[in-house]
């Protein structure tokens, strides 16, 4: 079966070409590392692109302080094993406000801790190109985004002010203060990602595999009880409804804003089989994508990845 998956090798070659092109063309690139499955694949491709040498750029994690604990443990493990140059940035303004998704809501929390945090980090270190693991099949606004996504000096995305991309030729020319967000996985699908992870045996966060976990239903979303902080924001009725269920995650982010899905897929072949049958987008589990109509495009216009 796997030896016939030639399209994966074509996608791999395209992504490696893009990564090498950016490393050669830009003065100070960085790779965003969100610790999820797409980041894992992108990082694997980057290591392949420059093997046996080390990555010629650092990896950046914009931390919100509300990621799953397993994600933090996995991040430290990967950094140690791969010898990565990791930069972690937390928005100090958000820390001062004790920003959290319960008191301030998902939109405000995401804007302050993710969007503003990312812009702060890019400005602080002067990065002129930033790799991201977004794919066109994820969401409508991402479907119309270029591989080289031009951002102005305020990090804003204007869908009408983008460069044509003919064949595999990309225009990375920017003025001082402007930058490019680069998406090497643009043409991959969620199924491609899982098949490639299986083919290459890429390590991923265990949360992607089904297991019995403590969850509570909040506004129709199964939220995992990842640490004690969440208990401070639950009503007595919600606390009483906490129960264990076989679930896994198709996408990972801040745990109060990431919905689990009921599943028994505990191995990579199980997940691939599940992906072949599913009819819903993985981002349906992201609360931030449902803030308002067109919310993702508006976030991207303001500087979100």
Swiss-Prot record:
It is an enzyme of class 2 (transferase). Pathway: Sulfur metabolism; hydrogen sulfide biosynthesis; sulfite from sulfate: step 1/3. It catalyses: sulfate + ATP + H(+) = adenosine 5'-phosphosulfate + diphosphate. The keyword ATP-binding applies. Its EC number is 2.7.7.4. Gene3D superfamilies: HUPs. GO terms for molecular function: ATP binding; sulfate adenylyltransferase (ATP) activity. Signal peptide: none annotated. InterPro entries: PAPS_reduct_dom (IPR002500), Rossmann-like_a/b/a_fold (IPR014729), SO4_adenylTrfase_ssu (IPR011784), Sulfate_adenylyltrnsfr_sub2 (IPR050128). It holds the Pfam family PAPS_reduct. It comes from the Bacteria. Keywords: ATP-binding, Nucleotide-binding, Nucleotidyltransferase, Transferase. With CysN forms the ATP sulfurylase (ATPS) that catalyzes the adenylation of sulfate producing adenosine 5'-phosphosulfate (APS) and diphosphate, the first enzymatic step in sulfur assimilation pathway. APS synthesis involves the formation of a high-energy phosphoric-sulfuric acid anhydride bond driven by GTP hydrolysis by CysN coupled to ATP hydrolysis by CysD. Heterodimer composed of CysD, the smaller subunit, and CysN. Belongs to the PAPS reductase family. CysD subfamily. This is Sulfate adenylyltransferase subunit 2. The lineage of its organism: Bacteria, Pseudomonadati, Pseudomonadota, Gammaproteobacteria, Pseudomonadales. The gene is cysD.
